[in-house]
Amino acid sequence: MNKTALIDFFSEFWNIEKSKIKDNLILNNENLHNHSSVRFYQFISALESNFDVKIENIENIFTFGDLSKNIISKK
């Protein structure tokens, strides 16, 4: 999965402008529309399903940069 595809998916899911998505974006309710722990896990699940990837170390994901570093291709 390339970073552009991740940004596109992230932007659509969270309804956030692509220009605001940077590696230091903190994934919390101040920055993400309708953020909750359940919604975050739904996002992770949708990401894994749609792109056939696995997210490792989910407990250590606090920023967009953390997210992009922990995506592992299943292929």
Residues of each region from the PLM?
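Phosphopantetheine-dependent thiolation modules in NRPS/PKS and related acyl-activating systems
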Residues: 1-75
